[in-house]
Every structure is written in structure tokens, then in C-alpha cells.
């Protein structure tokens, strides 16, 4: 892995692969720089030089404890600054918040931005948050993950059972301690869509047609951002890059490269 040092002093690691214009990927919670993009990264590598950042507690990145979402936005911005060219930026879930905040810090370095379902900081009710806190402190990471997916994201029991039986589940549970810190940082995050009214970078806001729309800030951001529109992913929920990778990658590439195609 490659490494940089963030303004906070934390060591941040990332993978680089592929060839083409720079595309920075910022993963969400309950995943890392590998698992979040496992099925779409090989597709992206045919069109882009892919920089997959490992957020705090993943890969060889420092596992800090009391960091904020703004700290992680600074990590993303530091990676972008190190690349030496303007980049395309894609963030998923928690990673979408970090990507958006990073873009606001250095808008001149971001060509276009893709945000897939950034959750409201209040996504978890006080009751569910308290239960997850107790499970985390007890080290019961499997129950912690189950509670998040079923009671937080409202994943149906049948779908959750299928997820737990798949080879995707073990990495999800393994990431739970880092995700616990993510959820704490998100809950403290002062997120107000209207703060981004002056951000003129073109933004595509992705949302799955099967996702509980009220959990995500997609519509509020579409109303606040001056150059943004929503693209729905038919039949998908929160993990479209895993459940429909070809469709997902085509949606992203079409948006990012449309001006390049017109210029050609």
C-alpha cells in the first residue's frame, strides 16, 4: 500500500491501480478499501487510475479513536492534493460525507463528485444507538452488525439471513470495531445541506429504489447543491456496487466521462 500523512499527523494508506484519469474511492462503514469496491474496481481500472483510500482503522491507516468526520475529510483532501491532478471523487455512505466535506475544502481539485446514500447523522434512534453502544462495549461485534443492518438500515430478516450466510459477512463483522468509531463520528457531525449551497462542482447523487429514502440526505442535498441531480439505481438498496456492479459502474462512468466523450 501507498501512504501519506494527514494534517492531523495520522498515517493514511491507499491502493493505486488502473490507468486513466484519477478516480478516488472513499468507502463506507462495515467495509474497507477492498470489500466496498471488490466487484466494481476491476471495471473502473479499465477507465481510470483508481485510488482506493483505506479510512481510519483499515488497511495500514492509523486506527485513531476520537477522530471526527472532518478529520477523515482532511485525510481524503490530503490524498487528493498528493495526486497532482484534478480528480473524480466517489464516496459511499459514511464515505460520501467524507468525500463531500473534502470537496468543500478543495473544490478546485475535484472535477466531479459522486455521492451514494450519505446517511443523516440521526440515522439511528437513541434506543438503537444505546443498544449498539452496549454491544460494542461487550465486544459482541456480530450482534452489533446484525442490529445495525436490521434495526438501522431496515434490512429484512430474509435478506439479512442470506447476507450472514454469504462470504461477505465475515469481513463485515471484522470491520465492526472501526465502524463503531465511524458511527460515533457521524452522530457528532454537524451536517447541514445548506452549508454546501456555494459548491459548484457537478454532483451525481445515487440512491437505490429499494432503500428507505428517509434515512439518507440525498433529496436535501439535491435541493441545496447548485449543480446536482439524483440518479436512481433500479432494484438496488444500499450496496448497489456489490449487488449490481456492472450497472453501478456504468452509471458512474457515464456521469464522470460524459464531457470527455463530447470533447472527443
Task: Pin down the residues of each PLM region.
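Conserved alpha/beta-hydrolase "acid-adjacent" motif
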Residues: 212-217
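Hydrophobic, aromatic-rich cap/lid helix
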Residues: 167-192, 210
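Conserved hydrolase catalytic core segment
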Residues: 85-122
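Conserved HGGG/HGGXW glycine-rich cap/lid loop of the alpha/beta-hydrolase fold
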Residues: 6-62
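Catalytic histidine-centered segment of alpha/beta-hydrolase-like enzymes
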Residues: 233-247
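Short beta-to-alpha linker loops that shape the active-site pocket of alpha/beta-hydrolase fold enzymes
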Residues: 54-59, 119, 234-236
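Active-site loop/oxyanion-hole signature of alpha/beta-hydrolase fold enzymes
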Residues: 51-90, 94, 250
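Short beta-strand/loop motif that positions the catalytic acidic residue
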Residues: 199, 205-207
Amino acid at each position: 500500500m501507498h501512504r501519506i500523512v494527514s494534517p492531523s499527523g495520522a498515517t493514511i494508506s491507499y491502493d493505486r491501480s488502473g490507468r486513466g484519469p484519477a478516480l478516488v474511492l472513499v468507502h463506507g462503514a462495515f467495509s474497507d478499501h477492498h470489500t466496498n469496491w471488490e466487484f466494481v474496481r476491476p471495471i473502473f481500472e479499465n477507465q481510470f487510475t483508481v485510488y482506493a483510500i483505506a479510512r481510519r482503522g483499515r488497511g495500514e491507516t492509523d486506527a485513531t479513536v476520537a477522530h471526527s468526520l472532518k478529520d477523515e475529510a482532511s485525510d481524503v483532501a490530503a490524498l487528493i492534493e498528493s495526486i497532482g491532478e484534478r480528480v473524480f471523487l466517489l464516496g459511499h455512505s459514511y464515505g460520501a460525507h467524507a468525500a463531500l466535506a473534502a470537496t468543500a475544502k478543495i473544490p478546485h481539485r475535484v472535477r466531479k463528485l459522486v455521492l451514494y446514500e450519505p446517511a443523516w447523522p440521526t440515522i439511528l434512534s437513541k434506543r438503537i444507538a444505546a443498544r449498539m453502544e452496549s454491544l460494542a462495549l461487550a465486544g459482541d461485534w456480530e450482534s452489533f452488525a446484525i442490529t445495525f443492518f436490521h434495526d438501522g438500515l431496515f434490512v429484512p430478516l430474509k435478506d439479512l439471513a442470506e447476507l450472514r450466510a454469504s462470504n461477505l459477512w465475515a469481513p463485515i463483522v471484522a470491520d465492526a470495531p472501526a465502524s463503531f468509531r465511524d458511527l460515533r463520528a457521524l452522530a457528532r457531525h454537524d451536517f447541514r445541506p445548506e452549508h454546501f449551497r456555494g459548491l459548484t462542482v457537478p454532483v451525481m447523487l445515487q440512491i437505490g429504489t429499494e432503500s428507505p429514502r428517509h434515512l439518507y440526505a440525498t433529496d436535501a442535498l439535491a435541493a441545496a447543491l447548485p449543480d446536482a441531480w439524483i440518479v436512481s439505481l433500479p432494484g438496488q438498496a444500499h450496496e448497489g456496487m456489490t449487488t449490481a456492479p456492472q450497472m453501478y459502474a456504468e452509471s458512474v462512468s457515464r456521469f464522470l466521462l460524459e464531457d470527455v466523450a463530447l470533447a472527443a
